[in-house]
Amino acid sequence: MVPAILKMKNALISTITLNPSLDQHLTVDGLVVDGPNRWSRLHRYAGGKGIDVSRAIHEMGGRTIAYGFIGGAVGRAVEIFLDEEGVPFSFTPIRGETRINFIITDSRTNHQTRIDAPGPRISKDEFARFQRKMQRIRPSPDLIVVGGSAPPGIPNNVYYTIIREAKKYGVRTILDADGQWLADGVKAKPYLIKPNVREAEELLGRELPDEMAIIKAARDIVGMGVEIAVISRGKDGIIAATKDTVLKAVPPEVKAKSAVGAGDCTIAGLALKLGAREPLTRACRLAVALGAAAVLTPGTELARRADVEELLPQIKVRNITSQLKKAISTTKTS
């Protein structure tokens, strides 16, 4: 019998990847600097934050469509990989060539090195065509996930614009970006953001040395107009805050093979449940299970449904709102 939490409701999640990629993951047996290297394994995948989220949603049996820019022979390869997985997409064609990213894993040390391309330059006409497509999305999504880097030629406030435009049509947005892209996007007050600790520190301009600091940071982000702030903490799980509630979700210990894609899988879990307007507790449980399942897979592979099913009963979700209120009260009286 399928657990109730894995029964996906009919919500449609659209993802936007402004800078898709063809990810090439190479494994070498001892990376040599200033010397010859020979890879032992090569895997190729369609990449980019939104695309990863769509792939993970599809793996879990959810409904999704991936949007973004695509171009050239590399772009066609990305579409072929998505076709083979059965992931629906509706990209805006461009003259430039979709980028190629390289991930190099040293099998001796298990260290990973990423080499990311900036991406093709997007013309004003190409961006205008993309905007028109977004205004005519059919069927209308229940939730839009947007994130990752933006290629050259894209306006600096692009995420702000996308989020504001979605709000006009009553569509909620999840923003998963960093740096200036995140800082600008937050000003449009998206439904949810999911920075990691480093990204949250950069957004708020302060260090977050412990759990209580992270909890307060999540509440401060909610105070900026975001409905749900989720801060991911790697193997320690996530902290999720709304104006009334703070949740802590923790995965079991797992033998990690690769952390690549874990954050995107976490977003997929949140989107699947919140897109269907299910409780935040269930969304956090599935999100952490998907994130933990992703680190069990090698290279840039994402979570497998079978691993998610095995991990779900082991995910602990606690309401720590009272703990926060007590800490604040103690601080005020001391």
Description of each model-found segment:
Residues 2-67, 75-77, 255-256, 321-334:
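Glycine-rich phosphate/adenosyl-contacting loop at the front of the ribokinase-like
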Residues 12-14, 113, 142-143, 228:
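Structural motif
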Residues 35, 58-142, 310-334:
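Conserved N-terminal subdomain of the carbohydrate kinase-like
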Residues 58, 160-167, 219-222:
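Surface-exposed amphipathic alpha-helices with a cationic face
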Residues 143-214:
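Conserved beta-alpha-beta core of the PfkB/ribokinase-like small-molecule kinase fold
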Residues 168, 183, 211-334:
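Conserved phosphate-binding/catalytic region of the ribokinase-like
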